[in-house]
């Protein structure tokens, strides 16, 4: 892969670059086969390298009274492939529910995005749903700058390349770029990259519900403060059996357990032996969230960054959470954030919703 241009890549100047609020952009094209491959404009908006930001989170999580591990450990390139298998598994109802809702409502949802807007997708993933939305915007003759924000460079590049095949830069009204970084990085980038045009943030796949209701409110507050509006897709299913089937099957097990080798890779040691851990899922009724855990198969002593952490057989480390919030709960979360649900599109059973959120 040839990097054809880049704004300063000098690591030493990184802190001064960040302090001037300039984010690195790189433009590259793949020419291995000599074919005309489109360039990818990728902005590295990370304020810290991934290992630098995640290792302290792993340590803090092991030190905390209720042990937890950063959910971001799940989202490396391999994690995204494993998540694709989750999306394809017949028991994973949120994927089919969101697809059919988007299919039915995509034209109406797209009316909330105007020509000239900047559309930023948080946690863009495989961008299959994105393609549906961008096709609709194109059919509505809108010119849109689309930015896919996600955390793994190689997965982001691969998925952008696939999307670019559908929307070639030369002939399409839709211009595609990438933002490499977390949601927080993206919020910081937005603050220093104000645009004259309106910004719409799209958060699909129930991803906002990976945070507690309080954290979700804080994210909304932060994004709305940049003057953006938000399109948020959320699962409101309350059927416990269906949730357990969907989140506790073999595909989910593999997806969650992949966090352990990723932790080892970032720590540079084999602190977590995957054979020592099992996966379990549970419903947390206080938070209206499903929670996934690593469970110690035997008594363990883990050495991480020079400290030893003891686990008795059966003790857990919490991994990812997935909230199941019906409309009333979503409205409450938005209100807490100083926002308001301006419009919403629900499936017939009212178990899945897409919400348009703006400042109150
Ligand atoms: C549940 S998947 C949803 C993917 C896609 N939007 C969809 O609807 O199929 C969550 C996506 O968010 C990304 N992600 C998770 N945590 C993130 C964070 N803190 N900042 C940025 N992206 C994140 C993951 O890499 C993944 O692509």
Predicted segments with their positions:
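N-terminal auxiliary segments of SAM/dcSAM-dependent transferases
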Residues: 2-73
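Conserved class I S-adenosyl-L-methionine
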Residues: 116-125
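Glycine-rich SAM-binding Motif I of class I
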Residues: 127-131
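A short, conserved alpha-helix within the catalytic core of class I
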Residues: 209-226
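Conserved beta-strand signature within the Rossmann-like core of class I S-adenosyl-L-methionine
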Residues: 226-239
